[in-house]
Amino acid sequence: LFSRLAFVLMAVVFGVVRMRNAYMRCPVSIWLFLGVFLLAYIYHGVGITMGYHRLLSHRSYKVPKWLEYLIVSGGYLCLEGSPIFWVTTHRRHHRYSDKPGDPHSPLDGQWHAFLGWMYKPTVLISAEESRVLAPDLYRDQLYRFLHVNHSHKDGLLCLAISIVYRAAIWFLFGPVVFAAELLASICAFCAPLLVNLYCHKPELGYQTYACGDQSRNVWWVAILSFGEGWHNNHHALPQSARFGLGKGEFDFTWMSLNFLKLFGLVSDIRLPKKNKLAELETADVS
């Protein structure tokens, strides 16, 4: 939690204040800011949903290792932290969804679902459980290095690398690009937290499939998180690379995967069969 709060503080001190002065000097900076913000938001957002989530956590498709690292870097550089920690936490969430053992269910409170779970000892995952839940990631030397022997130092390492990355952006491209990239990374960091907070609340969204928990499809969360908000679909069919399964359920990450597929960079895409969808459909769509 400390590293994440420090990240937000860094944004306030070095980004927002300096950016105001840049706007006053050059109106062109506004368009530069918006362009960089959009590109950086896509880079970091796709890094989380396509990288950490659909690739590492659920293995719903395959890409060359160099591309895997490139995609995952987008999530790492917006302080998602150790991929091993992220994946083990997420796999545990699916195992105990909305039940005792779920790391970040909103049934334990809104603050808990958004950020509070990150520093509660009750949701910490031991090294032994982590190796059981994510043996595939432990076989990867880079992910083991970023995990720093299952200690709190993995967050400090992620923070340090992120600071160096953004210092390089400031040095090479100036304060406008720096501020835009930093703000985009903060927004991307918050997107999966919105999924935790709003996509398991019975009073929001709707359920298309019966999957034994409170997962909901929430359209505006799906827009902000590149398809993650179709959360009921995902919980019903966690191995599916496509989350937006219904009419009008826009899934930017799924579109991005199809774009990469045009160049032969994606293979073994996992999708649900129609008979499986029919089995899971609920009679009462709330």
Q: Residues of each region from the PLM?
A:
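Asparagine-centered polar/low-complexity signal
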Residues: 196, 232-233
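Non-catalytic, topology-defining segments of multipass membrane proteins
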Residues: 1-194, 198-199, 240-286
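Active-site-proximal inter-transmembrane loops
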Residues: 137-145, 204-230, 236-237
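Generic secondary-structure boundary/loop-capping signal
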Residues: 52, 58, 83, 112, ...
